[in-house]
Amino acid sequence: MQAILALDQGTTSSRAIVYDAHGGVLGTAQQDFPQYFPQPGWVEHDPGEIWQSQYRVMIQAVERAGIPWSAIAGLGLTNQRETTLLWDRATGEPLHRAIVWQDRRTARLCDDLRRDGHERLFRERTGLLLDPYFSGTKLRWLLDHVPGARRRAEAGELAFGTVDSWLIWQLTGGRLHLTDASNASRTLLCNIHSGDWDPDLLAALDIPAALLPEIIDSSGVCGTTCCAGVPEGIPIAGVAGDQQAALYGQGCHEAGLAKCTYGTGAFLLMHTGERPIASANRLLTTVAWRIGGRTAYALEGSVFIAGAVVQWLRDGLGLIRSSDEIEALARQVPDTGGVYLVPAFAGLGAPHWDPDARGILVGMTRGTERPHIARAALESMAFQATEVIGAMEVDAGLAVKELRVDGGASANDLLMQFQADLLGAPVLRPADTEATAAGAAALAARAVGLNGARPSAEAAFTAFSPRLSRYEVEQRMATWQRAVRRAGGWARDDD
């Protein structure tokens, strides 16, 4: 027997899944780990906790699969993107907690870069916006605020990486400092047209090139394992950012196919072929993957808060005891009773890109009860996704005829039905909603010749067809957009 081990390092948990040569699941493991919030708008991880949680589930998944390590033909890796780490090349010790993609501490730096006339440079070469979401300004903050970091970086003593780089470093015993093209494209430092680190971008952010990892293909053996507890020599054969991995895992291998992953945030990608499409609607142009030196591109819209709004109802408000309860609670009412929740807890992502927006709950009366708020929270995910898809359709010049979905919240039938209603198009949910891990496994399987483990565009789906009239949808969207306008700019210091 031959198998693929997929590592899926996310924002709130690490997981590992072992797939057989036909794509069937043999064993899984998952472990949560904490986020830290040292100041309002700041979000951090402990790099050691990232690695230790990923290491533990890797071991557990293989044990639960009931196969020897010698059966693992390759390892695929996918990860939360943009989260930024800085560590000592000699010791492997981090210099600071990882700054998470949700973190907004560099909003003013982004303002300064725009004011200095750099926005066009970054937009044209990276396909991204000058926003705190991306890695480049986070790395600049670390260099400016960690004592001695800039001097040591210029001396070549430090390594920068996104989470894929950190895990590859750990898996190879510090022998390899790499990142794949999809992760590199999320840093504000990579020219997506040439596929290389861009000297002008580095200069604009004052970042030494000595910090940077080598950029590699998303599918291909880049090294082998060399860490305690894991046999040496297992090929590391696939690496991609989580949303690009999900696009691949959903079988969206042709231009015009789109998917939405509902995780902590919601992430929508549309494959656009082998040429990047510049967005006129504040979407991101990004690398989908690079295989055999050929780059596929995508349009992307990122919603910062999706499933995290359910966590907030559970942990912040105590409205539910577990996330699984929300659908049953929301079904107790036929609608939200006019309540709208805009979960701009960390600003708004695409297509608004407003770091100063903040969450609001509007439309409440004395008749508003827990189920109305629960339903408004679920509907907020669908409203945000619909805004992004509308912008994609304009940029790409075509209509999304169906949306493929995955991620934890895609198991919620109420949410998926409302998403189909708003889109006016079918929503297709695969039997296996772990498309992120499946994509990483498929990229690795491709590299080691296990083609049976690769995803099919014709996989079995559960379909949700639209039911609401277009008039009702237009009314609901208009009210949602009015609520969004009220949330906009709330934290801005207008004085």
Swiss-Prot record:
Chain sites annotated for binding sn-glycerol 3-phosphate: T11, R81, E82, Y133, D242
InterPro entries: ATPase_NBD, Carb_kinase_FGGY, Carb_kinase_FGGY_CS, FGGY_C, FGGY_N, Glycerol_kin
Catalytic activity, reaction form: glycerol + ATP = sn-glycerol 3-phosphate + ADP + H(+)
Regulation acting on activity, per entry: Inhibited by fructose 1,6-bisphosphate (FBP).
Sequence positions that bind glycerol: R81, E82, Y133, D242, Q243
GO terms, molecular function: ATP binding; glycerol kinase activity
Family named by the database record: Belongs to the FGGY kinase family.
The protein's name in its UniProt record: Glycerol kinase
Annotated gene: glpK
